[in-house]
Structures are given as C-alpha cells and as structure tokens.
Amino acid sequence: MFWLLAILAYLLGSLSFAILLSRLTGNPDPRMSGSGNAGATNMLRLAGKKLAVLTLLGDMCKGLLPVLIASLAGLTLQQQAWIGVCAVLGHLFPLYFRFRGGKGVATAAGMLLGIYPPAALLAVLAWLLAFYLTRTSSLAALIATPLTLPLLAWQEPAALVPMSVLTLLIVWRHRGNLRDLFAGRERHF
C-alpha cells in the first residue's frame, strides 16, 4: 500500500497548477516568464492575485491529500510523511511537464498541515513575518521551512527525517535565489 500511495502522490504532485492555470487563462508559461518558477509567487507577478491564490491552494492540496489518504489507510506517521515528500518531488520534478516544476514550498506546507498542523501554522506565521520584514518570498521560505524541524523533533519525531530531507530539497531548489540574495539581485515585492 505504501508504494502505491507514494507513486500516486508523485503523480498528483506532478500536476502543476501554475502551468495548467496559465494555459487555461492564456497567461504566459511561468517557467518561461517572470522568475521562471512554476509556483504561486511567480503567478502573482504574471497573472494576478486570483490565479496566484488558486495556484497556492492547488499546490497545498497536492501535499495535503496524499498524507490524509495515507492516514486513512492506516500508514504510520513516518510513512505518511514520506508520501508527502513524494508529492513534493512530483511538484519539483513533474512527470507531465518535462520535470521542470516549482520550488515545493506550498506543497510542503500542505504536507506539513496533514502531518502536524501546529508545525504548518508555525511555518506559515514565520513565512508571513519574514515576508513582511523583507518583502522577499524566497527568503521567507528559506527562513520558515527549517523552523519546523525543532518542533517536529520535539512533538512528532517520526516525521523529522522526511521533513529534513524536504527542507534540504527546498533549500537546494532555492540555490539560485540564494545566489541572488547574496549578490543583492533578488526580486522583492
């Protein structure tokens, strides 16, 4: 059951709401415009608030639904977390879009919401505060994601290793943003 759900989570994660919504509405492909990222922040820049919110919610659901299904199937918390990681991997490397996806922040937030809601709340609050102070989405994500690890280590240690792997993946996907941050070229709102 674990492997079946892991594969299905990856396939669900491979659905890119940013790309699909752009195609449906005649907006530019987010991978080819703006920051080049197929995610909610770039959709905000390219297509406005409505499509950005729809992208955010869709991407979060891609992380949340597989975890909830795994929970209903009786899988352990660690297995649920790994299934969530598979959904995020689908978002990062989508099968349907030549493996060029987003950065995984919203999908990881959805996964975290299913695993341990207080950690998701902490991540969202940290992201909002960091974004408010810096007006930089990538920096907010790089601050918020690792902050969940101590809380998980304390409350849900079974999810710590999968979430640590996910954190490393998200930081790796932001490596260009890190270069731009250090060079003073990162885009702000």
UniProtKB/Swiss-Prot annotation:
It catalyses: an acyl phosphate + sn-glycerol 3-phosphate = a 1-acyl-sn-glycero-3-phosphate + phosphate. It is an enzyme of class 2 (transferase). Pathway: Lipid metabolism; phospholipid metabolism. Keywords: Cell inner membrane, Cell membrane, Lipid biosynthesis, Lipid metabolism, Membrane, Phospholipid biosynthesis, Phospholipid metabolism, Transferase, Transmembrane, Transmembrane helix. It comes from the Bacteria. It is a multi-pass membrane protein. GO terms for cellular component: plasma membrane. Pfam families: G3P_acyltransf. The keyword Cell wall biogenesis/degradation does not apply. SMART domains: G3P_acyltransf. Its EC number is 2.3.1.275. Its main location: membrane. GO terms for biological process: phospholipid biosynthetic process. The chain crosses the membrane at residues 1-21, 77-97, 111-131, 151-171. Belongs to the PlsY family. Catalyzes the transfer of an acyl group from acyl-phosphate (acyl-PO(4)) to glycerol-3-phosphate (G3P) to form lysophosphatidic acid (LPA). This enzyme utilizes acyl-phosphate as fatty acyl donor, but not acyl-CoA or acyl-ACP. Probably interacts with PlsX. This is Glycerol-3-phosphate acyltransferase. It comes from Pseudomonas fluorescens (strain SBW25). The lineage of its organism: Bacteria, Pseudomonadati, Pseudomonadota, Gammaproteobacteria, Pseudomonadales.
